[in-house]
Amino acid sequence: MKTVRDIAGYLIGLLLFVIMIPLLMWRLSGNVHPGAAVIICFAVLAAAGIGLSVWSIIYMKNVGKGNPMDAFNHEVAPRTVNLMTDGPYRICRNPMLLGVFIYYIGLLICLQSWKAAVVFVAFFAVMMLQVNREEKRLKEDFGEAYIDYCKKTKKLIPYIW
């Protein structure tokens, strides 16, 4: 049963974050014809962002012994049992989300659409609510160790925020 929940969590994340939201951004943007340089920029940012997210997921599974899919305090897949402070979690406390944002910023550059930007801003706002709720739970789960980690590691943007 645990394997089914793991797979479900990964599939939901793939469908929502990698396919559905970018598809919505693209559909709302209308008839877009970016040049080669813009497409290359998108490809580089998409690869970097998705790569960071995948690294974070693998690290979470191997070190944290859990899964990333925990939506607004509803456990979709098994939660992590170990606090992760190394690997991609040394970069920021939410490297998986940072990777998604890098991917979406590449998409925004490619689409050059205010409608896609509105989707991004709405997604960003919802995800920040999720992150704040998740951080409260992590403080409960890991106590002082998590509080110390928060003091040393930025929430989302390395060295800034």
Q: Each predicted region: which residue ranges?
A:
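Membrane-anchoring alpha-helices and their flanking helix-loop junctions
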Residues: 1-86, 98-161
